[in-house]
């Protein structure tokens, strides 16, 4: 056992080392300032610049750094409800630094729960959740769900998976592993700790539907070997595993079949129709429409989806539930709408139709309305204006040479991404 005297000695040595390091740092800083001062005197003598303006050039960046440091020590978080220990849940969100996951993180944190975000940052970004870092209810873990995770939680929102065509076609094997092995690991965790698991499934399980609109009892029309099969079939297997664990192991599961969703924090280059059209319109490039543009989609704003996910998790509904906006638009109508909202003079360019592109997609949400009391409330134009504002700021950051991580490029032919 270490004696108190030895501990005091170690502490004293550490303090001396700290003082020495501080002294070295202060000396280096003083030397730098003196060098600049001498240089300024020389400049003044040569009549090139007054010493006062040079001092201001040096001091102002220092003031900025001090302000940044003060902000980091006095970080203000979004308002958080206080929940009693009985009501406060320990919640795990896989893929929680991604587009949808980060918005879900915001809601659950502000509702007063303890949230652990797990992400491998393949498509997720730390900047999406950095405003929570340091909060006592928040934890961020860099982890890939294809490896087991050991943690005590009450609820698991399993969102981890690439969701845009370029990302999951870039690495189809990884996509399959995330949706199968990753789901298996999360179900195993739910079984061990008695947690309820919500699987973020997708409308892609319906494939190119022969039934319109699509209700939860429709089995789908999917190409199992097509370019998108890694995602479509991966989610279908994930659903099957959820219900196998529910029947055999008694794990509580919830399955959300998510339709097209958009909003801030989408990757600008993720290859989906909303981000494609907004980015092209803002940059004055042609809006690329694949095929005739008569294909239909239904778009929901991200906050509506998040509310639906939370409602489903806390419900008694164990069968799959569609979460989407039943307001249907053709791709061509949607392109024209974004052009008008941006105020862009971009032309609309028609390209050859992509393989396996669904001709129609529209959710039947009667079940969500009846059993969850949920339906989308954000009007399409209101949501699009928010997304356009976000994309505009992202482009400004890039123009100012501020680093914005981008997803890895897909190894697919240009112009062949579907209207996801």
Swiss-Prot record:
Residue intervals on the Lumenal side: 41-420
Residue numbers carrying N-acetylmethionine: 1
A Pfam family reported for this protein in Swiss-Prot or TrEMBL: UXS1_N
Active-site residues annotated for this sequence: 231 (proton acceptor)
Molecular function terms, GO-annotated: NAD+ binding; protein homodimerization activity; UDP-glucuronate decarboxylase activity
Catalytic activity: UDP-alpha-D-glucuronate + H(+) = UDP-alpha-D-xylose + CO2
Keywords: Acetylation, Decarboxylase, Glycoprotein, Golgi apparatus, Lyase, Membrane, NAD, Phosphoprotein, Signal-anchor, Transmembrane, Transmembrane helix
Ranges per topology, Cytoplasmic: 1-19
Positions annotated with a glycan in the UniProt record: 316
Residues the entry annotates as binding UDP-alpha-D-glucuronate: 149-150, 177, 185, 188, 191-192, 245, 248-249
CC per GO annotation: catalytic complex; Golgi apparatus; Golgi cisterna membrane; Golgi lumen; mitochondrion
Membrane topology: Single-pass type II membrane protein
InterPro entries: NAD(P)-bd_dom, NAD(P)-bd_dom_sf, UXS-like, UXS1_N
Cellular location(s): Golgi apparatus, Golgi stack membrane
Class of the enzyme per the UniProt entry, highest EC level: lyase
Family statement drawn from the similarity comment of this UniProt entry: Belongs to the NAD(P)-dependent epimerase/dehydratase family. UDP-glucuronic acid decarboxylase subfamily.
Protein name: UDP-glucuronic acid decarboxylase 1
Organism from which the protein derives: Mus musculus
């Amino acid at each position: 056992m270490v004696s108190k005297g030895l501990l005091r000695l170690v502490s004293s040595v550490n303090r001396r080392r700290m003082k020495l390091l501080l002294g070295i740092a202060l000396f280096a800083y003083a030397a730098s300032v003196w060098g600049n001062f001498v240089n300024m005197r020389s400049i003044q003598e040569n009549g090139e610049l007054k010493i006062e303006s040079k001092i201001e050039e040096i001091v102002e960046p220092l003031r900025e750094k001090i302000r940044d440091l003060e902000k980091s020590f006095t970080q203000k978080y979004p308002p958080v409800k206080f929940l009693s220990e009985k009501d406060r849940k320990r919640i795990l969100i896989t893929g929680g630094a991604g587009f949808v996951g980060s918005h879900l993180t915001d809601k659950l944190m502000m509702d007063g729960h303890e949230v652990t975000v797990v992400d491998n940052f393949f498509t997720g970004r730390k900047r999406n959740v950095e405003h929570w870092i340091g909060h006592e209810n928040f934890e961020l873990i860099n982890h890939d769900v294809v490896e087991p995770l050991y943690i005590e939680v009450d609820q698991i929102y399993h969102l981890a998976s690439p969701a845009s065509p370029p990302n999951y076609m870039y690495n189809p094997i990884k996509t399959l592993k995330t949706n199968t092995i990753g789901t298996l690991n999360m179900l195993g965790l739910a079984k061990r700790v008695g947690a309820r698991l919500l699987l973020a499934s997708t409308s892609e399980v319906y494939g190119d539907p022969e039934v319109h609109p699509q209700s939860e009892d429709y089995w789908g029309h999917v190409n199992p070997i097509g370019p998108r099969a890694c995602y479509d079939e991966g989610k279908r297997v994930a659903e099957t595993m959820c219900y196998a664990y529910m029947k055999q192991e008694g794990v509580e599961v919830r399955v959300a079949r998510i339709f097209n969703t958009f909003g801030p924090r989408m990757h600008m280059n993720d290859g989906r129709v909303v981000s494609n059209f907004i980015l092209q319109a803002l940059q004055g490039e042609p809006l690329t429409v694949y095929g005739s543009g008569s294909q239909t989609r239904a778009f929901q704003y991200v906050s509506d989806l998040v509310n639906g996910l939370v409602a489903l998790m806390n419900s008694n509904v164990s069968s799959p539930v569609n979460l989407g906006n039943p307001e249907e638009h053709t791709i061509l109508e949607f392109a024209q709408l974004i052009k008008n909202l941006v105020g862009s003079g971009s032309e609309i360019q028609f390209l050859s139709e992509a393989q396996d592109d669904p001709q129609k997609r529209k959710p039947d949400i009667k079940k969500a309305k009846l059993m969850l009391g949920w339906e989308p409330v954000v009007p399409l134009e209101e949501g699009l204006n928010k997304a356009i504002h976000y994309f505009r700021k992202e482009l400004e950051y890039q123009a100012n040479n501020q680093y914005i991580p981008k997803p890895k490029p897909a190894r697919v032919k240009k112009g062949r991404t579907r209207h996801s």
